[in-house]
A protein has these predicted regions:
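Active-site mouth loops of central-metabolism enzymes
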Residues: 47-61, 129-137, 182-184
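Conserved phosphate-binding/catalytic loop of the ribokinase/pfkB sugar-kinase fold
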Residues: 122-149
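Divalent metal-dependent hydrolysis catalytic cores, especially in the metallo-beta-lactamase
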Residues: 46-52, 64-93, 109-122, 151-163, ...
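Active-site core of metal-dependent hydrolases
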Residues: 141, 145, 149-217
Length: 217
């Protein structure tokens, strides 16, 4: 919603806000200096304000400071995202995130969960992106459960490549647990893409980046 800050808001007899002078039309928005909206949600954030969320030595104070800075941009909810790495490294990343989240009320309010982006991705050049392909693996439920345990049960979104072995079997299990599943860093054919959607995939992580330039619609 865009509103004109040069005009006073309307209040009732008790002094409570009744309405704001709203500007209409996209053309007016281009000149807007103030925007009212619900808080924004960032589903994939690897770090902010110089703080790396994939640092196994992440300090709670640094984590909280980065969230305060993020809050000032209008983002009120985010999913700190752990990228592909060795299983031990990913576990350490989640332990550090959990320590930071549990240490601050702001983190608990802003972070409903985490995003696991890898290691069940396509290791081929062009699709793996900046992720280290040597750590990409076929998908197994046991592997995911170990990471979920390290994350305190708070992995709420996972990005996978549906053409990778084990992923199509993993998707419905994740969905059953209430975990949102996205495709990304992938190169599925038409049939595999449809099967992934039927299995429960509902999102695409940074669509157009780390995937084939043309995907079947």
């Amino acid at each position: 919603m865009i509103f004109d800050t040069s005009k006073p808001p309307l209040t009732d007899s008790a002094g409570l806000l009744k309405s704001l002078p709203v500007e209409a039309g996209p053309e007016r928005w281009k000149r807007a200096t103030r925007v009212i909206s619900s808080g924004l949600c960032d589903l994939q954030v690897n770090g902010f304000a110089g703080v790396d969320y994939n640092d196994t030595t992440l300090m709670p104070e640094e984590f909280e400071k980065s969230l305060f800075t993020m809050l000032s941009t209008g983002v009120t909810t985010c999913l700190p995202t752990v990228i592909t790495g060795s299983e031990d490294w990913q576990i350490q990343c989640f332990h550090a995130l959990e320590e930071g989240r549990n240490a601050a009320k702001l983190a608990q309010a802003m972070i409903p969960g985490y995003h696991l982006e890898g290691p069940f991705l396509n290791p081929e050049e062009g699709f793996c992106g900046c992720h280290p392909s040597k750590w990409m693996r076929p998908a197994t439920w046991d592997h995911f459960e170990r990471l979920q345990e390290a994350a305190g049960g708070r992995i709420t979104l996972i990005t996978v490549a549906p053409e990778i072995k084990g992923v199509l079997d993993l998707i419905p299990k994740l969905v059953e647990k209430g975990i949102a599943v996205a495709i990304g860093h992938c190169n599925p054919d038409h049939d595999t893409l449809l099967r992934a959607a039927d299995a429960g995939v509902t999102l695409s992580t940074h669509l157009g980046n780390g995937i084939a330039q043309i995907l079947p619609k």
